[in-house]
C-alpha cells in the first residue's frame, strides 16, 4: 500500500501528495484516511479523480471532510470502491460504500464484494426482448407500455408525482413480479427513503429487495457514485445468478447535479447551463451498464427531475436518448386533479407497435391519442366561442375525450392513506377493453365525474350509481 499526505482540503475535494518517486494510485482507486474525532478514529474514503503531476492527485471524498487537516496520512487501497453483492444484500440498506445503514449486523470482511467501476457488457452479450411488463396502471399500460429488460424514464418537474408513481410501480411490479428488486435513492429526501423502507417491510417485499441510499445531505461524491453502487448489486444478480432484476433509481437528475458540483470543484470549465463538459459521457457510462444480456435482464425505472419544467435542459435531454419508454408528468394535469398526471400525448414507448402489443391494443391506443389530440386542438375554440360553435360530431368527440382524460386517472395503493380510496390494479386486457367501449360511445350518457380516479369501468358504473345516475 503506497501512502501519501493531504496537502489541501476544499470542501469535498482533497489533494494528496505521494511524492515524485512513489507509485501513484490509478484513477477511480479508493484511498483511505483516518481522522481523529474526540479520541475516536474515523475512516474516510476518497476516490482519485485527477492526476495533478509531481506525484500529487486530486480526490473526491465519499463522506464529510470535516476534521481533515493537512499532513494526515492517506493510504492507497489499490482498487476501486467495492460493495457487497449476492443474496445476503437482500432486505438490507446500504450507503455508497456498501456499509450497512439499517442498524443491523455489518457484513463480514470476507463477504463477496465487487468494484463499482466496471465496463458495460459487450455488443455480442446484449439481448433485446419484446415482452410487455404489465404495471396495472391504465395510462402507462395503454399508451406507453414498458418492456421487460427495458429502460423507462419518469419525467416531471417538482411536486408532480414522480416518487409516488415510482412507489406505486414498486408496489405493483415488485409484488406481481416476485423477483429481485434493487432500489437506489440518489440525492433525494431521506424521509421518502425511510417511508419506502417501512412500507416495503410491512408488505414483505423487502425480503427480495436491496436498498442503496446517497441522499440530499451527502457530499456530491457520494451522490455521484451511489447509482453505480445500486447498479453493481443489480449486475451481480443478472450476470452471476441469471436473474431478471428490477432496478429503481430516484433520481437520475441528482446524479447529473452531483457530477456538475464535482466537475466545478475539480476545476473543469463548465458547459451549457453550467453543466459539466463530460455530461454525455457520464450518463452514457451509467446507462450503458443498465442493460439486458443473454444471461439475465435488468428492467430499470428511473425518475428524472425536469428543472423548471424545461425538457430542453441538458440533464433530462441527455437522459432521453437512452430510454425505451418515457412517462411524462404534466403540471397542468395536477392542477385539473388528474392523478397520475401522465401526459398521454407526450409519453412514448417503442413497445407501441402491433408486433409487440397486438393489433387491437395498438389501434385502441392510436384512437385514444387521436381523440385527445383533436380535443386539444378544439380547446381554443371552446375557450373563445364556447361549446355551441362546435358541430354535433365534435361535441360527441369532446365528451368522449373528457371521459377518456378522466378515466386515465387512477387511485394508487401507496396513496390510500391520503385519499381514503382503495388503490386499483387493472390488467392490461381489461384496460384495452374498457377504452375500446368508451371510444365506441357505450358510456356517452354516464356523467364525466364518475370516470375520475377509478380502476376498471365497473368502478365508473358503481360511482355513477352512487351519484344517482
Swiss-Prot record:
Subunit annotation: F-type ATPases have 2 components, CF(1) - the catalytic core - and CF(0) - the membrane proton channel. CF(1) has five subunits: alpha(3), beta(3), gamma(1), delta(1), epsilon(1). CF(0) has three main subunits: a(1), b(2) and c(9-12). The alpha and beta chains form an alternating ring which encloses part of the gamma chain. CF(1) is attached to CF(0) by a central stalk formed by the gamma and epsilon chains, while a peripheral stalk is formed by the delta and b chains.
MF terms (GO), sorted A to Z: ATP binding; ATP hydrolysis activity; proton-transporting ATP synthase activity, rotational mechanism
Membrane topology annotation: Peripheral membrane protein
Name of the protein described by the UniProt record: ATP synthase subunit beta
SMART domains: AAA
Family statement drawn from the similarity comment of this UniProt entry: Belongs to the ATPase alpha/beta chains family.
Keywords: ATP synthesis, ATP-binding, Cell membrane, CF(1), Hydrogen ion transport, Ion transport, Membrane, Nucleotide-binding, Translocase, Transport
Organism: Lactococcus lactis subsp. cremoris (strain SK11)
UniProt keyword RNA-binding present: no
Pfam families: ATP-synt_ab, ATP-synt_ab_N, ATP-synt_VA_C
Catalytic EC class: translocase
One Gene Ontology cellular component: plasma membrane
PROSITE patterns cross-referenced by the UniProt entry: ATPASE_ALPHA_BETA
Primary localization: membrane
PANTHER family noted in UniProt: ATP SYNTHASE, ATP SYNTHASE SUBUNIT BETA, MITOCHONDRIAL
Positions that bind ATP: 156-163
EC code(s) of this entry: 7.1.2.2
Amino acid at each position: 500500500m503506497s501512502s501519501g499526505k493531504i496537502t489541501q482540503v476544499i470542501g469535498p475535494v482533497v489533494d494528496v501528495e505521494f511524492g515524485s518517486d512513489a507509485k501513484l494510485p490509478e484513477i477511480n482507486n479508493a484511498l483511505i484516511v483516518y481522522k481523529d474525532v474526540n479520541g475516536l478514529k474515523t475512516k474516510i474514503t476518497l476516490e482519485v479523480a485527477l492526476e495533478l503531476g509531481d506525484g500529487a492527485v486530486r480526490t473526491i471524498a465519499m463522506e464529510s471532510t470535516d476534521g481533515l487537516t493537512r499532513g494526515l496520512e492517506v493510504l492507497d487501497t489499490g482498487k476501486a470502491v467495492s460493495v457487497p453483492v449476492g443474496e445476503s444484500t437482500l432486505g438490507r440498506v446500504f450507503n455508497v460504500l456498501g456499509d450497512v445503514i439499517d442498524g443491523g449486523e455489518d457484513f463480514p470482511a470476507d463477504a463477496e464484494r465487487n468494484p463499482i467501476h466496471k465496463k458495460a457488457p459487450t455488443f455480442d452479450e446484449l439481448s433485446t426482448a419484446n415482452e410487455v411488463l404489465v404495471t396495472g396502471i391504465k395510462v402507462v399500460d395503454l399508451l406507453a407500455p414498458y418492456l421487460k429488460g427495458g429502460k423507462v424514464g419518469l419525467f416531471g418537474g417538482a411536486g408532480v408525482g414522480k416518487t409516488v408513481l415510482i412507489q406505486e410501480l414498486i408496489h405493483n411490479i415488485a409484488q406481481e413480479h416476485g423477483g429481485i428488486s434493487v432500489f437506489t435513492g440518489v440525492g433525494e429526501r431521506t424521509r421518502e427513503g425511510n417511508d419506502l423502507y417501512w412500507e416495503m417491510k410491512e408488505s414483505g417485499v423487502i425480503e427480495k429487495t436491496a436498498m442503496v441510499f446517497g441522499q440530499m445531505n451527502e457530499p456530491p461524491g457520494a451522490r455521484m457514485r451511489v447509482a453505480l453502487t445500486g447498479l453493481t448489486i443489480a449486475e451481480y444478480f443478472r450476470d452471476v445468478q441469471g436473474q431478471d432484476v428490477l432496478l429503481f433509481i430516484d433520481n437520475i437528475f441528482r446524479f447529473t447535479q452531483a457530477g456538475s458540483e464535482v466537475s466545478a470543484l475539480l476545476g473543469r470549465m463548465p458547459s451549457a447551463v453550467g453543466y459539466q463538459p463530460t455530461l454525455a459521457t457520464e450518463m452514457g457510462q451509467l446507462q450503458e451498464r443498465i442493460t439486458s444480456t443473454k444471461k439475465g435482464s435488468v428492467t430499470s425505472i428511473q425518475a428524472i427531475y425536469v428543472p423548471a419544467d424545461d425538457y430542453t435542459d441538458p440533464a433530462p435531454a441527455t437522459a432521453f436518448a437512452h430510454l425505451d419508454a418515457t412517462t411524462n408528468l404534466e403540471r397542468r394535469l395536477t392542477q385539473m386533479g388528474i392523478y397520475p398526471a401522465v401526459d398521454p400525448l407526450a409519453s412514448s414507448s417503442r413497445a407501441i407497435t402491433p408486433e409487440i402489443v397486438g393489433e387491437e391494443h395498438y389501434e385502441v391506443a392510436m384512437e385514444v391519442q387521436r381523440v385527445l389530440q383533436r380535443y386539444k386542438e378544439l380547446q381554443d375554440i371552446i375557450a373563445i366561442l364556447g361549446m355551441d360553435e362546435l358541430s354535433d360530431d365534435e361535441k360527441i368527440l369532446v365528451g368522449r375525450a373528457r371521459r377518456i382524460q378522466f378515466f386515465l386517472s387512477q387511485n394508487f395503493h401507496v396513496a390510500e392513506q391520503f385519499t381514503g380510496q382503495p388503490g386499483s390494479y387493472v390488467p392490461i386486457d381489461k384496460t384495452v377493453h374498457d377504452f375500446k367501449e368508451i371510444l365506441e360511445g357505450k358510456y356517452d350518457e354516464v356523467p364525466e365525474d364518475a370516470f375520475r380516479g377509478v380502476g376498471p369501468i365497473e368502478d365508473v358504473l358503481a360511482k355513477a350509481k352512487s351519484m344517482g345516475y
